UniProtKB/Swiss-Prot annotation:
Highest taxon of source: Bacteria
Locations listed in the record: Cytoplasm
Keywords carried by this UniProt record: Aminoacyl-tRNA synthetase, ATP-binding, Cytoplasm, Ligase, Nucleotide-binding, Protein biosynthesis
Entry's Gene Ontology BP terms: leucyl-tRNA aminoacylation
Location of the motif 'KMSKS' region: 659-663
Gene Ontology MF terms: aminoacyl-tRNA deacylase activity; ATP binding; leucine-tRNA ligase activity
Signal sequence region: none
Name of the featured protein: Leucine--tRNA ligase
NCBIfam families in the record: leuS_bact
Name of encoding gene: leuS
Stored CDD domains: Anticodon_Ia_Leu_BEm (cd07958), LeuRS_core (cd00812)
Annotated Pfam families: Anticodon_1, tRNA-synt_1, tRNA-synt_1_2
Amino acid sequence: MQEKYNHIDVERAAQDHWSARDAYRVTEDQAKPKFYACSMLPYPSGKLHMGHVRNYTINDMLTRQLRMKGYNVLMPMGWDAFGLPAENAALKNKVPPAQWTYDNIAYMKKQMQAMGLAIDWSREIATCDPDYYKWNQWLFLKMLEKGIAYRKTQVVNWDPVDQTVLANEQVIDGRGWRTGAPVEKREIPGYYLKITDYAQELLDHVQVGGDKATLTGWPEKVRLMQENWIGKSSGVRFAFTHDIRGADGQPIQDGRLYVFTTRADTIMGVTFCAVAPEHPLALHAAATSPKLAAFIEECKKGGTTEAELAVKEKEGLPTGLFVTHPLTGAQVEVWVGNYVLMSYGDGAVMGVPAHDERDFAFAKKYGIAIRQVIAVEGETFSTEAWADWYGDKQRAVCIESGELDGLPHAAAVDKVAELLAAKGLGEKKTTWRLRDWGVSRQRYWGTPIPIIHCEDCGAQPVPAKDLPVVLPQDLVPDGSGNPLIKSEAFHAGVVCPCCGKSARRETDTMDTFVDSSWYFMRYCDARNSEQMVAEGAEYWMRDQNAATGGSGMDQYIGGIEHAILHLLYARFWTKVMRDLGLVKVDEPFTKLLTQGMVLNHIYSRRTAKGAKEYFWPKDVEHVFDETGKIVGAKLKAEVDSADGLLPVGTDIDYEGVGTMSKSKNNGIDPQELIEKYGADTARLYTMFTAPPELTLEWNDAAVEGSYRFLRRVYNFGAKLSQMDMAGAVQSVAGAKSLDDVEFGKAAKSLRLEIHTVLKQVEYDYQRMQYNTVVSGAMKMINALEDFKSFDDAGAQVALIEGFGILLRVLYPATPHLAHALWSELGYAAHLGDVLDAPWPQVDPQALVQDEISLVLQVNGKLRGAILVSSTADKAEIERIALANEECQKFTNGAVPKKVIVVPGRLVNVVV
């Protein structure tokens, strides 16, 4: 073997070997336990970042170790290839999105292969491939048949720059999440999926502490996020009546303004109602009020997420309209509020300022009456300032509420529901925050929705035999909207499946979350042209703990930023596929790991014009105070900036650490890292620096340390290669029994340390605590390097055994180096390639100690330690303790009154 560690040669040779063997192609094998681990598929943006490296290395370590333990493992990979970034890149570079996407896929695939990932590339998919998205379209048609998919017109968030609909979560401070353009409200038709039909089941399986919860292998934080997003609320839905008539002379909404509340016990405290800007009553009032019309237009530009509405200033205008309180008959004024969403509930809320903090602030701002109707013993109510107890329903009882007086919350709600039901104006109801999933997107680069529009027959589904509806690959967006609308080729030859007349295709495409809602199942049957999923999915997605039901994939890995939308949609999609008889599982992912972000230092300065520009860490050095704390930064190299060339020593602002980002110039290019140090170093560093679920703060010095560690391992292997290893390897490989080897004291000590660490490492692998796996490997190499008793009985066998264990422990993290040393030192000749070598077993005999150390105390005070035989009885321990020099020194010749022995721990001489 080479004398010095050359990562380029080592990694090239290992990858060539695995490629020649087709080492990671996997088939279904009923004779082995299966394990399916999958990382969230990446968007082909052009290059991998360190977050990708960390995610995929976690997956790789998991599957490599389990393969050694006899599992049939699957680690696939694909590309989430549709979406707006490709269109925008195409617009900028004047090339079709398909060309940009496939070029990026090719480059990123090479990067993954350079990482040495154990991916079965025979199962590779790209969601922009017609062979893949055909099944998006097929299942959409099935949902249409079952009534799960439907078409409706609804007010949506419209990004005027990207010219597409945005989900509420994609609107930030009233602007599009990607373009930053002010978002408009538009009413347009689109297709929706009835995820709300599955709301209860989606909640049951994820609910923390719920008796039907199955996703106990998910982080509690993610489960709570989904639980809150689904948002089940129990309360009362009721109507305020009115006789407000529209242009047609009929009462608007049949003369009823419906609201939902979880605090029906405060109904007697209603002093106003607020409706959403798009509510029919608001629009009716705005028709004769320019001021109100202008306010409504302004509201359309605001943020639409609940989180944004919670923090923005509450504003409103009175409509001049009044509705009737259903229990008191009092007239209640209707306001338009910028904090009311038309898409939630009925687009209206009752205002109870005395007992709702938001309503209290609104009433104080606009001088609306505040009426107390609940009380808590020992508390005094004031309209001057809000106090938390005003909204307390646990201790509250009703006052000033007629026949509700004296009732606690639950009883009062029941009574109100009874009174409203008697009037035909309300009932108890369960509501959900969850809304049906709008899947129509007004953009080109996505799955075509398989609908044909006929002037006579309307919207008609494309016959299944005509799938896929293929997206043109050669269109280049010009910024003027969806190019499918103008593409004659896309519509050429299209006829209505009902009447046969010439027709046009639907030009909306599907939300890209559709693509990522089931790709992990397609990996299981990636080349099946006849079925969406088949036997492969039945094998890989089966629950190993039950014949049917339960969860499928064994381990899913990805960022917590996908906790709600992607994971919720994937769960819904799986349940739909189950109900259509395509799969047998209730949930897609048995266990979920949300890996932490990779962070790095951020450096910036303001230009002469006030803009902020960022600097690469490699060009900056820190300034420290006397305590060693970073207090600033300065350039250590000349750097071009908007203000010209900045000299060395220029002061730079230090912003602390944050997520690696292209925009902040604080990312690390994995390719440069691999070229300089090797893939094994990159992998080892990302695993060692922090537990997988925690953030990783980048440290160049620690990267160097990881490289030096690998060099130590290689150098020790080179040292062993000078020994006659044949016989020792045979013993380690089982060709000869270790029971026949006589180990001396030093060899036994080495084996004790190696097997003790191995026992902990085994536990750490089970917990996916890979940082402590690596630290265990470091303890092993320390023990091996410290071993000097080469003439000791069994020394050679102990060394070879210990190094073989180390290589297998390290192999999942640093497969190239482990492969090279395993082969060069002869282990492979007896145990096969390291990727298929059996996982090392802890030898119970190695953990048996001939001697143990006991703490020595005199009169309860620590005076040293003694070595005794592990089988020594109390009398023997007493004899050794009393003969100890330190014991004699501190007893000063006195006869001990007694000697206390705590087995395995200490001996205390009392004088």
